[in-house]
């Protein structure tokens, strides 16, 4: 089985292959087809078994990017459409990096938001527009309470 057979778009497959990722792990084979349809899923697997791409690839594929036909029909183009909550800064960075690799050939912009770093560059990322937010609860709550993070367009939420 390969990612294309799971329903992943060719641009994402190409981005993965450019990094040597060609075959899905078992958790990905189980999760991806369900997640692509928008179903709620719960996945559990050991560290290093591919959970991030199991939820991340469908998330990237399901958002509407700047060059997509549906972009103009969005209520607020550039507002986040997917929110991925992670418990630590380190995991936020890892998940953000993995999703950035997968979205390299796609119009899905990914921002990684967490505390312990300057606030303003993260607000600037949100202002410029993006499709996927990966972040820690504390920083996301802060950005939301200050009006920098809009959640009205979020249709995918992941708790990692």
List PLM regions with ranges.
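SF2 DExD/H RNA helicase N-terminal ATP-binding lobe
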Residues: 2-160
């Amino acid at each position: 089985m390969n990612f294309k057979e799971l329903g992943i778009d060719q641009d994402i497959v190409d981005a993965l292959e450019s990094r040597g990722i060609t075959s899905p792990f078992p958790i990905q084979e189980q999760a991806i087809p369900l997640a692509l349809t928008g179903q709620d899923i719960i996945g559990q697997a050991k560290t290093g078994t591919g959970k991030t791409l199991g939820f991340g690839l469908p998330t990237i594929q399901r958002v509407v990017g700047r060059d997509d036909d549906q972009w103009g029909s969005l209520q607020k183009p550039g507002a986040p459409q997917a929110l991925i909550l992670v418990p630590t800064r380190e995991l936020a960075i890892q998940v953000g990096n993995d999703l950035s690799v997968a979205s390299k050939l796609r119009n899905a912009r990914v921002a990684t938001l967490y505390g312990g770093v300057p606030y303003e560059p993260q607000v600037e990322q949100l202002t410029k527009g993006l499709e996927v937010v990966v972040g820690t609860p504390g920083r996301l709550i802060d950005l939301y309470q200050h009006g920098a993070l809009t959640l009205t367009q979020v249709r995918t939420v992941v708790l990692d």
